Amino acid sequence: MKLVQTIKELQSELDALRSEGKTIGLVPTMGALHAGHASLVKRAVAENDVVVVSDFVNPTQFNDKNDLAKYPRTLDADCELLEKVGAAFVFAPSVEEIYPEPDTRQFSYAPLDTVMEGRFRPGHFNGVCQIVSKLFMIVNPTRAYFGEKDFQQLAIIREMVKQIGFNGLEIVGCPIVREEDGLALSSRNARLSAVEREYALNISQTLFKSCTFAKSHPVAETQKFVEDAIAAAPGLRLEYFEIVDGTTLQKITDWEDTDYAVGCITVFCGEVRLIDNIKYKG
């Protein structure tokens, strides 16, 4: 495995491999890797000849400078994990390498990017599209892998690729990876205290219970079930919970409105903002 920090070196390496007919998988990350990321890389390794993992904390997608400053950075540990799971290259550029000058590009994929995360984190998805599109242009991968935990992000990236093309790039969504007790794996979990970690379990437990509840109750009652459960749980503050069409991300009012229904949630546990989702249909 090779650690690469410049675009020029990475492209030189990949051009040589591409000329041999090799397929290239890309797993974009912001580092602070965990077993969820490892599962993405393993899938990419199984489906491509060569896998590139980007390890870059992208400043343009943070609308909160405090959140950016606190985001964990663990490159040495990341490289250790990536070597074990078979990545060929770790691309860990500086901010100056990626953004030699400010990126002023504006991406708009309404209504996908105006709801949920888009409503509460203005500019976030524009920053995501800036970095992901740059990585696609730098790496020119055959396939790129994203986790379904960031459900809205995955939908927006699919739409971006549909509109821009990127040489027929295939976007592969991979299931949420959870701890044995159900907590969705997240780099932000490292910021939870032991007590907060216990509190955070109520998020996934509530979603799992709501799946059973939804089988015999309408959408509005399922919505209220989740909102009430989080409100009653210690140490948690609900930012939003929405039951949406999994393709359009628009709210549904009846289970018959769609064949693909997903509940998306964001909760503050102390100062740590956690996201999760669950499929009700589809």
Swiss-Prot record:
Compartment(s) where it occurs, according to its Swiss-Prot or TrEMBL record: Cytoplasm
Residues holding ATP: 30-37, 147-150, 177, 185-188
Binding site for (R)-pantoate: 61, 153
Annotated catalytic residues: 37
Ligand binding (beta-alanine): 61
Recorded GO MF terms: ATP binding; pantoate-beta-alanine ligase activity
Pathway: Cofactor biosynthesis; (R)-pantothenate biosynthesis; (R)-pantothenate from (R)-pantoate and beta-alanine: step 1/1
Assembly and interaction partners: Homodimer.
Name by which UniProt lists this protein: Pantothenate synthetase
Organism: Phocaeicola vulgatus (strain ATCC 8482 / DSM 1447 / JCM 5826 / CCUG 4940 / NBRC 14291 / NCTC 11154) (Bacteroides vulgatus)
